[in-house]
Amino acid sequence: MKQKNLITVVTDHQITADTIAKAIGANEKHDGYYLGNGYAVTWTNGQLVEATFSPQESFVLSTTMESRLAYAHNFKFAMRNYDELVGYKKSAEDNRQLDTIKNLWKMSLTVVNAMRPDITGDLDFLSLYYFIGCPGDTRRAWLPVLTKKAIVHAVNHGPQNRKEYEKWLEESIYNAIVQAAEENAELKGSPTVEEISVADAAKDAECAGVPAPAPGEQREGDNYIGVITDRCPLFNLPALMIQAACELDYTHEKTILTAYRLYAKKLISYPMVMQNTIPGGVWKAMLRNMEMLRYNSRWGRSIPEGKPSKCHNFRNGETVYNGFGIVTTGLHPTDLSRDEEKLYNLIVKRVIDAFAPDSYGCGRKSKGGKKKSRRYRKEKKVKTVKTA
C-alpha cells in the first residue's frame, strides 16, 4: 500500500466491496481491500465498531452542537466483542481488517462512506470514524442500487441533494440519541410510510377484535404512517421475509442474506426495513426497468401494457433518504444460485403486480361509449439487454 492521495471507499461487506471495486476500476485484489485507478475499496464485515450510549454529562436536548459531534459526545466506541454466550468474541480477523482500514484511511485524501443506505449505515461509519480518530475529508456515497452508473456518481460526487441529506442525517442522529436516552421528546423529521394491503390490515384487525380499516385510512405512530391500500404494495424487508417463509419455506435469516446478495449483484434495490413507497425518481426509472423485464423469459409476457402505476409514489412528505420499496434495476440475472433465483422471482412477481397500470383490466371507451379493442404492440427494434 505505497500509493498516496487515495480515495478510499468503506462499505459493509466484501460482496458489496467487490461490486463497487469493479465499477470504479479498483481491480487489484489484496488482503482486506481492492486497489486501482486511484481508489481503494475495503469493508468492515458488518458493525466492526460498536457505539454504547454514555453521555459525558447530563444530556440536553436543546443543544446547538452539530449532529455528528453530538453523536460523539454521547456515545463511547469500541471494537465489537459480543459475549461468548452468544457465540462471538473479538477475533483476529477483526483486528486485521481494522488495521487495514486505518492504514488506508491515513493514506487517503478522501474517505467515502458507502455503508448501507439507511441511518444504521451512517451511524456505523461515524462510530468507525471516531474510534479510528483519523482526520480527513469524508463523503457519503448513498447507494440504494449498485449499478455502475450509480456507484461512479455517488463515490465521486456524494448525495444528489446534499442539503436534503444533511437535514435528514441531523434529524436522524437527534432521534437516535433521544431513543438511546429514553427521553420523552418528540422525534424530528419526516415520517416513514408503509403501505399495508387491505387483506393484511383485515387480518390484523380480526386478531385485535376491531373493525377492518378501509382503503385510504391511516395508522400513525412515532414518525410512522401506515397507509391502507387496495393495491398490491411493494415489498419491504419484513414483508419479503413473511412471504418467503410462506411460499419458499425460507428462514428469515436466509431471506435477509439472499436479498442482500441480490442487492450486491445489482438486481434489486436495497431491502429497506420499513419504507415501501417510492419517490418520483424511482417511478421514472421503473418506466425503463419494466420494459427491460419484458425480455425476461419467465415474466416478460405477464407484464401488462401501459405506464407503471403511480399509486405507490410518496404522498406524506417523506424524504428519499427514508428509502423505498424493493424494486428491480432493469439488469438481467446471469449467475444466480437456485435460492437466489427463487427469491428474485418472488420479488419480480410483486414488482409486476405493484406497478400494474391503474387501468389494467378495463377496456378503454371511445367517445361514443363503445369499448375499444386492445391494440397489439408494434414490433420494436431489438434492444441490447444489459446483464448484471
What are these regions (language model features)?
Residues 249-264:
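Short amphipathic alpha-helical interaction segments
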Residues 227-244, 269-273:
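Short acidic, hydrophobic short linear motifs in intrinsically disordered regions
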